[in-house]
Amino acid sequence: MTNDDLTITDPKMRAQGVNVFYGDKQAINNVSIDVGTDLVTAFIGPSGCGKSTFLRSLNRMNDTVASAKVTGKIELDGEDIYAPSMDVVQLRARVGMVFQKPNPFPKSIYDNVGYGPRIHGLAPSKADLDVVVERALVRAGLWDEVKDRLNESGTALSGGQQQRLCIARAIAVDPEVILMDEPCSALDPIATAKIEELIHELRGKYAIVIVTHNMQQAARVSQRTAFFHLGTLVEYGKTTDIFTNPKQERTKDYITGRYG
């Protein structure tokens, strides 16, 4: 794995020698990577390469799979997220997740965003919660479209609006990292453009990691790109370098469409 010319001196997250197993099958093999604050990091690679599995290991979503086992070390601000003392609920508030398919709760738009802050004690009063909900919807670029519809069901929104609602839901609990697992794959081009614009706007506030099959999207939204193949991290570098001057032959073959 090549990771030359990376200057992430104070990473938000650091993975060292990470392996992920599902039963006897190894899905991730000895992956080490740093995720920087105020950067968008894209994970690319063909289907089944392990990029989504590795993403889910960054906030212990693999814990929900009975056969999954993770070894190695993953740190958030220097703290081992797999340590027995780690509060997984708090971890997932600090490292939020936006999934491939929009999955709003069967609740009102307001309650979709307000649920997390309420259970985490971030909004002691209704007035406080109103402020948190509005701020999250503004940051997600959705406030102007829904401010007069807050009591309507989140499932009544369009697909693109639902995905932005899910992003608002994630950022309402004031995370430090946002993980996005192919957030635009189920959306039309107009909705995709809005999500990409939102990613640019959020970059200065959060460390963002996005899994995408769309190499053009990775090139547009990220500053760092990691190429995965067969469960290994083949190459990690500045996005411009990965797409214009990859150091590994497998990376070049994938970027130029020879496989994938």
Curated annotation (Swiss-Prot):
Enzyme class: translocase
A Pfam match: ABC_tran
GO cellular component, one term: plasma membrane
Signal peptide: none
Catalytic activity from the UniProt record: phosphate(out) + ATP + H2O = ADP + 2 phosphate(in) + H(+)
Any one of the GO BP annotations: phosphate ion transmembrane transport
Domain ABC transporter: 13-255
Its EC number(s): 7.3.2.1
Principal cellular location given in the protein's record: membrane
Residues the record lists as binding ATP: G45, P46, S47, G48, C49, G50, K51, S52
Compartments where found: Cell inner membrane
GO-annotated molecular function: ATP binding; ATP hydrolysis activity; ATPase-coupled phosphate ion transmembrane transporter activity
InterPro entries: AAA+_ATPase (IPR003593), ABC_transporter-like_ATP-bd (IPR003439), ABC_transporter-like_CS (IPR017871), P-loop_NTPase (IPR027417), PstB-like (IPR005670)
SUPFAM superfamilies, alphabetized: P-loop containing nucleoside triphosphate hydrolases
Keyword terms, alphabetized: ATP-binding, Cell inner membrane, Cell membrane, Membrane, Nucleotide-binding, Phosphate transport, Translocase, Transport
Lipid bilayer topology: Peripheral membrane protein
Function noted in UniProt: Part of the ABC transporter complex PstSACB involved in phosphate import. Responsible for energy coupling to the transport system.
UniProt xrefs under PANTHER family: ABC TRANSPORTER I FAMILY MEMBER 17 (PTHR43423:SF1)
Family: Belongs to the ABC transporter superfamily. Phosphate importer (TC 3.A.1.7) family.
NCBIfam families according to UniProt: 3a0107s01c2
Subunit structure: The complex is composed of two ATP-binding proteins (PstB), two transmembrane proteins (PstC and PstA) and a solute-binding protein (PstS).
Protein name stated in the entry: Phosphate import ATP-binding protein PstB
Organism: Sphingopyxis alaskensis (strain DSM 13593 / LMG 18877 / RB2256) (Sphingomonas alaskensis)
Gene name per UniProt: pstB
